[in-house]
Amino acid sequence: MRIFIDFNIKPTNYSKDSLLEFINMALHLGYRALVMEISSNEEAELIKSLSGKRVKLYTRYTILAHSPSELKKTSRKVRWTDLIIAECFNQETARIAAKLENIHAILIPPEKLSLINERQINSMKMKERPLEIKFMDIFYTQNLQNTIRLIAKYLISASSKIPIIISSGAKEPSEMRSPRDMIALFSILGLNQEKTLDMISKNPYSLIRRLA
């Protein structure tokens, strides 16, 4: 039985009631775990206090990495989260992110998927470093047609070599998407259905299990 995980929830409000709304929506949609973006130890403690048997909660901190030095400096400082994700905007930073031991996954905006070339894939493969793509980024891109072309060109090829994680990037419970919606979109874009299922279950679960 697959355990579906939304790997990227970005609450705009960290009150207990707001987080419970995300948990209830996760249950409704069929998720068993959420990975929630945080920026402080206080947020991390609140999220951990709400984690339960029905929906497990994990924390993540995303570094907006515009340079290797910025990425290295910030990743050394962050201590109060389960996972550190590097969102990369250029090739040099993406290559460093693939090598740093304290980076758990690499997030690439859809318009930057050309960064996932053979050299980058090989570096990520050696470290078993997953690639994350946000569902919401696809629909908020300025050029949807070009984004679809990039997904077809780079993501389908990479999916046979490195683990890929699809996340919602939802800021409100209403922005969350069901596993079925995720599968439908990426199947239309040309990804194998079984691999798409892995991207919202097996691949994020494998990463989370390493935290135990």
Write out the residue ranges for each language-model feature.
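Regulatory helix-to-disordered linker/tail regions at the edges of structured cores
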Residues: R60-T62
